[in-house]
């Protein structure tokens, strides 16, 4: 067989694999710097996407308060505009607000202008609600292309993904979701042998419309928060997670 006929498809396959890795794999740095871990194994960054959600977010805030847990909320701009009081409450209770675009599109298929518009509109919504824009950004579905991280950087935002995505958006019972957060406990038990900690990505809202039942997420967190605390984990915002703790 002509070696060219072999080489061309092979090169195309390798190229496709590289793009897939860059776009989908949370730890990939190919398209630019992405935060995907905390700087200390004793830290756990709790992050919540797709809110604010009047049906769930207030209950979540109360739960976090019980454990003196600070978290990062990656909010959708159009929901921020509908829920300005709730957005202000998130910030007032010590949590960090971050950018999750205006409408939650798949940015992988968009060009730089559309990507920039999505990010800027969410920044404007946050500016209007709480008086300042976000410093951190998470792309919807975690998908990136060459313009996503560079555009976020132009808007003075760092891009954040995760170490654990347990799939709480799926229509599964809490008994299915809870064990999928077990890796955090296992990592905490091995903290002495690790030099970084976990970023958990779960959801307090649903991106298609305002609201959504995320009670399974609350149920799983009710189980895990006291156990993670007892393992010595400190619940931190992303801003705290990227700075080395004082000794």
Where are these regions (language model features)?
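Alpha-helix N-cap and loop-to-helix initiation/capping positions
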Residues: 110-117, 176-179, 212-220
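Hydrophobic alpha-helical topogenic segments used for membrane insertion/localization
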Residues: 1-24
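A cross-domain feature marking catalytic cores of carbohydrate-active enzymes
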Residues: 48-50, 73-77, 99-101, 139-141, ...
